[in-house]
UniProtKB/Swiss-Prot annotation:
Subcellular location: Membrane
Keywords: Membrane, Transmembrane, Transmembrane helix
Lineage: Eukaryota, Amoebozoa, Evosea, Eumycetozoa, Dictyostelia
Top-level lineage group: Eukaryota
Residue spans of biased composition, Low complexity class: 253-262, 280-300
Membrane-spanning segments: 11-31, 56-76, 151-171, 175-195, 207-227, 392-412, 413-433
Region of interest called Disordered, as start-end residue ranges on this chain: 250-300
Entry coiled-coil feature ranges: none
Topology term for the membrane: Multi-pass membrane protein
Main location: membrane
Protein species of origin: Dictyostelium discoideum (Social amoeba)
Record-given protein name: Putative uncharacterized transmembrane protein DDB_G0281465
Annotated Gene Ontology cellular component terms: membrane
Length: 451
């Protein structure tokens, strides 16, 4: 049995996906484990080694999240995406408890250990009741770096905000516009010019902060997005089952269009005597009108130019259009007047007339009401069944939540450029994936930028 080259490439793509998932999850577990052992590390190394270790962890985080997003873009099963989301939620709850203020951590531990576990008898399992607080601390890693309530509140608000974008296409589109155009290009360019001048005059280095943000947002962020789009196209290209379904659907739509066109052609009556005989023209026109009344209607408008009337006929025809993967019937008006035979005065008279709404023809009115934004990045439509977009957004949000805990816990050890690279990259990835999750990869109407 001969194996097709497409099948071989598809298998290789899946092997790459498994490899990337394995590496990225290992990096994530290692990062969370280093966070749990933070107290022991801090007691054994100086500030320089701690700073180097923190920077290495940030680099690991970048490698992990990029490899994870690339692997996910190749295509995941629904159960696998939900498994990943559940795993990251559990790990994030564990991190949240680690960073609770001390009083809240103690109250939660007492509530869980002495308020819940005390109701059960652990004698048969060999667990001593007095050791339950220790087991609790070992599972959650202890209260390693307490945050203030304000910081935890800001983190929670950002998680809720980006989660909301994943369900609201209007907010996602507007935020994408603000983030990519106003912030990433206009404001960044203005600050780059201002800080370049002030740094030369005052011997400062603020311009590196702006460059770091631009690098994270427009280089790392958009670079990762383009790789994702490439893999979406590649994985759908190698999916024989999905492609065969699309081909069958396309052939079915084309057959429907051909049948409708044939029906319209059968109802057309050609009046060949209209320019030779007035009576035959009149009789032929009446027969044509009666024969085609079921499929078209004729609207006549008259324009007077120097006592010469110009008769324009707008014939209403029904055409078949494709909208959101469905074939729909739509009426359009076609002007049958031969403008090449009109003189200049007649053309000016027609152009000076107000345009009626019935004269405006369009294949899809909703397309003309939409707006096309700059940085128009579109996911392929045939990737619908391959990407669990909302789970994807949720997992990436929790990846960003992990690095935010690293940055906040040792803020004094990191430089502003290092932080801004993370902020720019995270903002671009989350904003883009939110627009994907909101509407592009569902069966709803397309995003505004897809029109």
């Amino acid at each position: 049995m001969e194996i097709s080259p497409t099948k071989i490439k598809s298998v290789l793509l899946k092997l790459i996906q498994i490899l990337f998932f394995t590496i990225s999850i290992s990096i994530y577990i290692d990062l969370v484990g280093n966070s749990n052992n933070k107290n022991n590390i801090n007691n054994n190394i100086n500030n320089e080694e701690l700073l180097l270790n923190k920077q290495i962890q940030i680099y690991y985080w970048f490698v992990g999240i990029i490899l994870f997003s690339i692997a996910w873009s190749i295509g995941t099963f629904k159960w696998l995406s939900r498994f990943f989301l559940t795993f990251f939620i559990i790990k994030s709850i564990q991190q949240l408890i680690q960073h609770l203020p001390i009083e809240f951590y103690d109250k939660l531990r007492n509530l869980i250990v002495f308020g819940t576990f005390s109701k059960f008898d652990f004698t048969s399992t060999g667990i001593i009741t007095e050791s339950l607080p220790t087991l609790y601390d070992n599972f959650f890693g202890g209260n390693i770096s307490p945050f203030s309530i304000e910081i935890i509140g800001i983190q929670s608000c950002l998680i809720i905000f980006f989660s909301t974008l994943g369900f609201n296409i209007y907010l996602a589109d507007k935020f994408w516009l603000i983030k990519t155009i106003i912030v990433d290009w206009i404001i960044s360019a203005i600050l780059l010019i201002i800080f370049s001048i002030t740094d030369l005059l005052m011997n400062q280095s603020n311009v590196y902060s702006v460059i770091s943000y631009i690098f994270g947002s427009n280089v790392l962020g958009f670079g990762t997005i383009k790789i994702q789009e490439f893999l979406w196209n590649l994985s759908s290209k190698y999916d024989d089952k999905l492609n065969s379904t699309i081909i069958k659907s396309t052939k079915s739509n084309n057959n429907n269009n051909n049948n409708n066109n044939n029906k319209q052609d059968d109802n057309i009556i050609y009046d060949t005597d209209s320019s030779f005989n007035g009576q035959s023209s009149s009789s032929s026109s009446s027969s044509s009108s009666s024969s085609s009344s079921s499929s078209s209607a004729t609207t006549t408008t008259t324009t007077l130019v120097n006592d010469n009337s110009i008769i324009s006929e707008y014939v209403t025809e029904k055409i078949m259009i494709e909208e959101n993967g469905e074939i729909k019937e739509q009426e359009v008006q076609v002007d049958k007047l031969d403008y090449s035979k009109l003189n200049e005065d007649q053309l000016n008279a027609i152009l000076s007339e107000p345009i009626l709404e019935t004269q405006i023809t369009t294949r899809n009115v909703s397309y003309h009401k939409s707006t096309r934004f700059i940085n128009n990045l579109i996911a392929p439509e045939n990737i619908n069944s391959r990407i669990s977009a909302k789970e994807f957004v949720g997992v990436i949000i929790l990846w960003v939540y992990t690095i935010s805990n690293f940055i906040i816990s040792d803020y004094s050890l990191l430089t502003i450029p290092n932080i801004l690279v993370v902020v720019g990259f995270s903002g671009t990835i989350l904003t883009y994936l939110s627009t994907i999750s909101a509407k592009r990869l569902t069966n709803k109407n397309p995003s505004k930028r897809e029109c």
